[in-house]
Amino acid sequence: MRIIRFIGVACVIGLFFWCIVAIDEVGEHPDKIWLHRCNSMEKLYEHSERYSNFEVDIVFRQDSVFDVTHDIDTSFNLSIEPYFGYIQQNGGKLWLDIKNLDLQNVSAMLTQLADLTSRYDIDKERLIIESRNWQALQRFTEEGYYTSLYIGWENPSRLESEEIDSYMDKS
């Protein structure tokens, strides 16, 4: 019984010290921490000292403008261009969560994004393109962008293979 207690106490102490080291490590990798839903320049400037990388929700409009907004039916008339200007001047990376990417607009988006990266001299490696539509997202991957497929389930690792196939078919 003493051995079990000793092992238990040793594990708790070990876990405690591991937590201290892990917490200390968080500050050592600021490039791994992203500011989520940075959908206003005010929020970007407010948190710019702490975060060098940020995620922005965008909708691609009929006039080939990337509109910064979370909801397709809402616009605040904020273009993505100030964000490109910001990372051109200050460094960092930009995660674009595209809310309406599909096979009908992917070519126009690629053209517009190529123009923006060229105009602001931003390498593709500094961007992450996210969408729920894996087929359209594949085109971004083929063009050399880092991509992220959004899966809208709480625990995607617990999905059965049939559920994964069903989701992929719907996307």
What kind of region is each of these model predictions?
Residues 2-171:
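Phosphate-group recognition and catalysis centered on beta-loop-alpha active-site segments
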